[in-house]
């Protein structure tokens, strides 16, 4: 769902029911800002494109779940994503509950975006709380910008500490459970904090994922 191929154009135009005159400019283009860094410049169909992308992923998740359960109904169907929901739309993924409406919180979401949350499709969900600030109080002291691997630009806010991430995830996932993940190599030089992030994830989420377990075996 990431390309600007002729097929994607055709499918997107069918989805919105109209032709896109300037493609991909009416979706978005990369422009240099005053600092010489590339940033996205959204076009008039940017939000609908993001909606369409996440619909494709959620449709795939529904099909994949159907196949898995047909093979063995007892098998848990699950997934992993990063925890940084405010920018995760950039990779076409809406791992939230359909009961949560991101359009009330984020400018990139359409009113229809909520229809394509896939939390209710999965039995097992792990997410990456890969932050060195553990508590909200600690984050507010550092106010650090975080640039996750999927981000087009740096992010900031209480989403970007372990405690805050877990709180926000509870809000967007509603009654769906999640396991908070830790990135072990962030704490090689500070094992005390490794213990803190493990404790916080166990306290605020529904389990723990260790990424990558081979780092410590």
What are these regions (language model features)?
Residues 1-133, 137-138, 142-143:
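Polysaccharide-binding and catalytic clefts of secreted carbohydrate-active enzymes
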Residues 113-217:
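Substrate-binding cleft of secreted/luminal carbohydrate-active enzymes
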